């Protein structure tokens, strides 16, 4: 897996600009609603990343729509295009369940993968670009950062692309997670992490081990693309996000110890927020427009107090918006879909394709095609999708079809559902399962049901009826009509519609 090399975000932006994938906006634009409107129109048109050089009221530029096309996601992962992301998935599948070499020849075949693993440890620096400027104490003022307000009814400006760094009291490895953070004061943010996410689990363990003590937290903004994407990729639990970023980049991830705590942050990050969460300090978060296309409920979450802001000279603020698909998370979902396929295929070799339609909010509906081998096979695959990767814990609907169906073509999928399913026999309902807290359709917050649809051809044991045979054209007739098609001139110019 030959990687394209980027040392930091600025390196990546230079390459994007050279390829016409970055547009600098010099006209003054307001971070309050206006940047979202421009970024949304640009993303829907498949346009470039946007660097707003003169956000109204601020001296710091805003970067938006960085991963607004699958191509730029692939480039951020060090690949030339989306098709090569399957190689990233194969590497992750190998790392999730590595197989020892079966012999001398197999050792040489696996050597490239083992070489990549050697790049995994981080490299700690004594000084780093992210600490070129430091403010602390009363000088900390988050209002100097052009934090966007994305939608008219949003409660306040919202940090969206922060990489939150935490470590549990009994863990050697840090956790990187992306959690939105509402601005509520010059040095205060609300940390919206759900109870099952890595950062929240680290916090819960800390509170149990150190009752009443402050929990150290750091947030990196504008890290290099490999590190950013490492935080949203299905990395095996035994592998750190920094290590995975090193694999993508082909070089060890450079980190630096924070000024005020022992956490390590990306050395090249544009901005780092350092601080703590005081157990018991909570605040109501929201409402905010989110990736479902709705405003979510207000709920209480911990307050993150920022004690230090470190940053690069001429720092860039990296941001995004979330709304009804397509948005940037939906585009990331389309690209990362290619990463998921080899991981699932390693566990379930019968899977031919796996697709998360972006209009299904990136993860709420999955279509799987399989080479069916026995009665009940589709139901086994449904259960596997829900349980194998935690990324699909919140997938509400799983549709399983045969391999003669194109998982990415709704015409095919709907045809299979309507012709191969009996609703009572082929629908699986599972109650009281984990559901996204943002899913207001569930009867209880965080707990709801799932539906599996078996749209495969039915085998003996699944039906007593004679099963229909799909209509197929005679290939000889098709070839003959192809040969005389132009002579027919049905469409005047002789070309088929």
From Swiss-Prot:
Similarity annotation: Belongs to the UbiD family.
Catalyzed chemical reaction(s): a 4-hydroxy-3-(all-trans-polyprenyl)benzoate + H(+) = a 2-(all-trans-polyprenyl)phenol + CO2
Enzyme superclass (EC): lyase
Membrane topology label: Peripheral membrane protein
Pathway the protein acts in: Cofactor biosynthesis; ubiquinone biosynthesis
Protein residues bound to prenylated FMN: 178-180, 192-194, 197-198
Residue positions binding Mn(2+): 175, 241
Catalytic residues identified in the record: 290
Protein name: 3-octaprenyl-4-hydroxybenzoate carboxy-lyase
Domain of life: Bacteria
Role of this protein: Catalyzes the decarboxylation of 3-octaprenyl-4-hydroxy benzoate to 2-octaprenylphenol, an intermediate step in ubiquinone biosynthesis.
Its EC number(s): 4.1.1.98
Names of the cofactor(s): prenylated FMN; Mn(2+)
Annotated Gene Ontology cellular component terms: cytosol; plasma membrane
Subcellular location: Cell membrane
GO molecular function: 3-octaprenyl-4-hydroxybenzoate carboxy-lyase activity; metal ion binding
Gene Ontology annotations of biological process type: ubiquinone biosynthetic process
SUPFAM superfamilies the record matches: FMN-binding split barrel, UbiD C-terminal domain-like
Cofactor note: Binds 1 prenylated FMN per subunit.
PANTHER family the UniProt entry points to: 3-OCTAPRENYL-4-HYDROXYBENZOATE CARBOXY-LYASE-RELATED (PTHR30108), FERULIC ACID DECARBOXYLASE 1 (PTHR30108:SF17)
Keyword list, A-Z: Cell membrane, Decarboxylase, Flavoprotein, FMN, Lyase, Manganese, Membrane, Metal-binding, Ubiquinone biosynthesis
Assembly and oligomerization: Homohexamer.
């Amino acid at each position: 897996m030959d990687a394209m090399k980027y040392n930091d975000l600025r390196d990546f932006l230079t390459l994007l600009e050279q390829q016409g994938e970055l547009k600098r906006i010099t006209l003054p634009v307001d971070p309050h609603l206006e940047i979202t409107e421009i970024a949304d129109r640009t993303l829907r048109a498949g346009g470039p990343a946007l660097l707003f050089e003169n956000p109204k009221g601020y001296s710091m530029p805003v970067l938006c729509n960085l991963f607004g096309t699958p191509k730029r996601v692939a480039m951020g992962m060090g690949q030339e295009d989306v098709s090569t992301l399957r190689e990233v998935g194969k590497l992750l599948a190998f790392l999730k369940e590595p197989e020892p070499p079966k012999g001398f020849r197999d050792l040489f075949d696996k050597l490239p993968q083992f070489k990549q693993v050697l790049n995994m440890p981080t490299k700690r620096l004594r000084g780093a670009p992210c600490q070129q400027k430091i403010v602390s104490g009363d000088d900390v003022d988050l209002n100097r950062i052009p934090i966007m307000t994305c939608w008219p009814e949003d409660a306040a400006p919202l940090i969206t692309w922060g990489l939150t760094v935490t470590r549990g009291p009994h863990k050697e490895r840090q956790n990187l997670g992306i959690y939105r953070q509402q601005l509520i004061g010059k040095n205060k943010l609300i940390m919206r992490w759900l109870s099952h996410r890595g950062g929240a689990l680290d916090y819960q363990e800390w509170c149990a081990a150190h009752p009443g003590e402050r929990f150290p937290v750091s947030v990196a903004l504008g890290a290099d693309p490999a590190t950013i994407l490492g935080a949203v990729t299905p990395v095996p639990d035994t592998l750190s996000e920094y290590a995975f970023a090193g694999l993508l980049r082909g070089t060890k991830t450079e980190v630096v110890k924070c000024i005020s705590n022992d956490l390590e942050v990306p050395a090249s990050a544009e901005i780092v927020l350092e601080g703590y969460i005081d157990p018991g300090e909570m605040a109501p978060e929201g409402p905010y427009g989110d990736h479902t296309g709705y405003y979510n409920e207000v709920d209480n979450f911990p307050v993150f107090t920022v004690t230090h802001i470190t940053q690069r000279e001429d720092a860039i603020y990296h941001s995004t918006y979330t709304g009804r698909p397509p948005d940037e998370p939906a585009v990331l979902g389309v690209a990362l879909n290619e990463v998921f396929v080899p991981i699932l295929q390693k566990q379930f070799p019968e899977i031919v394709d796996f697709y998360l339609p972006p209009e299904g909010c990136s993860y709420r509906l999955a279509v799987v095609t399989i080479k069916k081998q026995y009665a009940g096979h589709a139901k086994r695959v449904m259960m596997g999708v829900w349980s194998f990767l935690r990324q699909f814990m919140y997938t509400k609907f799983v549709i399983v079809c045969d391999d003669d169906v194109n998982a990415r073509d709704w015409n095919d999928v709907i045809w299979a559902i309507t012709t191969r399913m009996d609703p009572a026999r082929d629908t699986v309902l599972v109650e009281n399962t984990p559901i996204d807290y943002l899913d207001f359709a569930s009867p209880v917050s965080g707990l709801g049901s799932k539906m599996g649809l078996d749209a495969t051809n039915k085998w003996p044991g699944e039906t007593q009826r004679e099963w229909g045979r799909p209509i197929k054209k005679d290939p000889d007739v098709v070839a003959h009509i192809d040969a005389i098609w132009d002579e027919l001139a049905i469409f005047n110019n002789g070309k088929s519609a």
